Each structure stands twice: as structure tokens, then as C-alpha cells.
Amino acid sequence: MPRTRKKVEVKVAPKGAKLQLKWIRSAIQAPVKHKLVIKGLGFTRLNQVIVREDSPSIRGMVAKVPHLVEIVQQ
């Protein structure tokens, strides 16, 4: 039986859309890659809220660490 791929819908945000992200859990025991994602998003301290452009790259970074970061507002 041939394998078929799932069709995935990609959500495209309107131009200029912003995401508010909040760092909710410490990355002390997290793997190094997760720490690098937190740093790459621009977080410097716990419970910090930052605003980033809504892009596939930012959403991908948030998807890597959903247990550490939450989307406050879209």
C-alpha cells in the first residue's frame, strides 16, 4: 500500500500581524536546543511578554517549546 501524505493547511497571517508571547516556565532542565530557541525568540527573563511579527519562522520556534512559552494574544 503506498504511503500518502497528510495535507496540512498553513495559516497565513495578515501582513503586519503581531504575536504576544510570554515565557511561562524555566528552561533550567530543558535541553540546550530549547534554551537556544528561547534566546532566539528574544526572551531574557521569566514571565516576560514580548511582541514579535507573526511569521512561519516565529510560529515554528514557538511550536518547538510549547511547554515553556504561551501565545498571549494573536
Swiss-Prot record:
GO annotation terms (biological process): translation
Database matches in InterPro entries: Ribo_uL30_ferredoxin-like_sf (IPR036919), Ribosomal_uL30_bac-type (IPR005996), Ribosomal_uL30_ferredoxin-like (IPR016082)
Keyword Cell inner membrane: no
One cellular-component annotation, GO: large ribosomal subunit
Entry-linked Gene3D superfamilies: Ribosomal protein L30, ferredoxin-like fold domain (3.30.1390.20)
Leader peptide range in chain numbering: none
One family name in Pfam for this protein: Ribosomal_L30
Subunit note: Part of the 50S ribosomal subunit.
Family assignment from sequence similarity: Belongs to the universal ribosomal protein uL30 family.
Name this polypeptide is given: Large ribosomal subunit protein uL30
